Design a protein with these regions (language model features):
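N-terminal assembly/interaction segments in proteins that build large macromolecular machines
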Residues: 1-178
Length: 178
């Protein structure tokens, strides 16, 4: 199968985010995640990179550029289908999509949609019970404050929960290109 990775590396300014050496370090770190499959950022930082380790390369670049940068988190996946990636907004938003079925255009469009709409999960089954309950409580509170009749409050709350689920699930959202 094909492996892919996405990594979050934070810096302080857009100037550094566009710097070729910073971009090379970030790409190198993502490549290391794919090839070495480290357990976490600490394990990633001690992996061989260039003449030394990734952490040594990061520290040297911080010294050279004069701005801090941190490897915050990463995700690695073994694709079941075809991997698509989409990086948006000067690399501030990134999507790594494993698509089983579909074609090249669908993969690109879905990755772009995910970047734009930021779904929390594929469908309602992936939304935590706590998030749903919190949404329900807020809706009940608002309905009571608005003086809605007691008999309607539960229906109003259920409608709010359904709208929330449409907004936060990939399958519930209106497709960006629609």
């Amino acid at each position: 199968g094909k492996s892919g990775a996405i990594i979050e590396v934070n810096c302080e300014t857009d100037f550094v985010a566009k710097n070729d050496e910073f971009l090379a370090l970030t790409k190198g770190a993502a490549d290391l995640v794919v090839s070495a499959n480290p357990a976490d950022v600490a394990a990633l930082s001690v992996l061989p990179f260039g003449e030394s380790t990734l952490e040594a390369a990061r520290t040297a670049l911080v010294g050279k550029i004069g701005e801090n940068m941190t490897m915050r988190r990463f995700v690695r996946t073994e694709a079941k289908g075809k991997l698509f990636s989409y990086i948006h907004g000067g690399a501030k938003i990134g999507v790594l999509l494993d698509l089983v079925g579909g074609d090249e255009q669908l993969g690109k469009d879905l990755a772009m949609h995910i970047a734009a709409s930021k779904p929390k999960s594929l469908d309602a089954s992936g939304v935590s019970a706590d998030a749903i309950e919190s949404e329900r409580r807020v809706a009940i509170e608002k309905a009571k404050e608005a003086g809605k009749p007691e008999a309607m409050i539960e229906k109003i709350a259920e409608g709010s929960v359904q709208k929330f689920l449409k907004d936060v699930t990939l399958l519930g959202q209106v497709f960006v290109k629609a």
